[in-house]
């Protein structure tokens, strides 16, 4: 197994699919990385040379991935909550942020039902 951006990449899968195991790299980004490095997206990781894997490592390092991306997302949410804006309040209360209805739906975001006290 090759190790790119601190993630073990499966050897027996195509390069594009293997790169998506990295948090922050989806199909489109993986295809762009393959195009930038000149690596065949259909080639399996085990068939690539060490030089090609190093090129992939360097190209992935140019993107914000894994821990840095998680930290950036959490800091953005924390900033919204500290500002006290509407989106921050919704995050703080654990409700949907993007305008979805909450009268009947949003069970995942709101959590399990709480019994009504009489």
From Swiss-Prot:
GO BP annotations listed: translation
Statement: the UniProt record of this protein carries the keyword Transmembrane: no
Q: Which residues form a coiled coil?
A: none
Instruction: Extract the signal peptide range.
Output: none
Q: Region Disordered: start and end of each range? A: 93-118
Record keyword rRNA-binding present: yes
Quaternary structure (record)? Part of the 30S ribosomal subunit. Forms a loose heterodimer with protein S19. Forms two bridges to the 50S subunit in the 70S ribosome.
Q: Which family does it belong to?
A: Belongs to the universal ribosomal protein uS13 family.
Q: What does this protein do?
A: Located at the top of the head of the 30S subunit, it contacts several helices of the 16S rRNA. In the 70S ribosome it contacts the 23S rRNA (bridge B1a) and protein L5 of the 50S subunit (bridge B1b), connecting the 2 subunits; these bridges are implicated in subunit movement. Contacts the tRNAs in the A and P-sites.
Know the name of this protein? Small ribosomal subunit protein uS13
- Annotated source species: Pseudomonas paraeruginosa (strain DSM 24068 / PA7)
């Amino acid at each position: 197994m090759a190790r790119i951006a601190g993630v073990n990449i499966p050897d027996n899968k195509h390069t594009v699919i293997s790169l998506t195991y990295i948090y922050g790299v989806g199909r489109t980004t993986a295809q762009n990385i393959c195009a930038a490095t000149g690596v065949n997206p259909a080639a399996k990781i085990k068939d690539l040379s060490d030089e090609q894997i190093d090129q992939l490592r360097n190209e992935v390092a140019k993107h914000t991935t894994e821990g840095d991306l998680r930290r950036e997302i959490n800091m953005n949410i924390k900033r919204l909550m500290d500002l006290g804006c509407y989106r921050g309040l919704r995050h703080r209360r654990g409700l949907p942020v993007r305008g979805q209805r909450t009268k009947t739906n949003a069970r995942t975001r709101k959590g399990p039902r709480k019994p009504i006290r009489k």
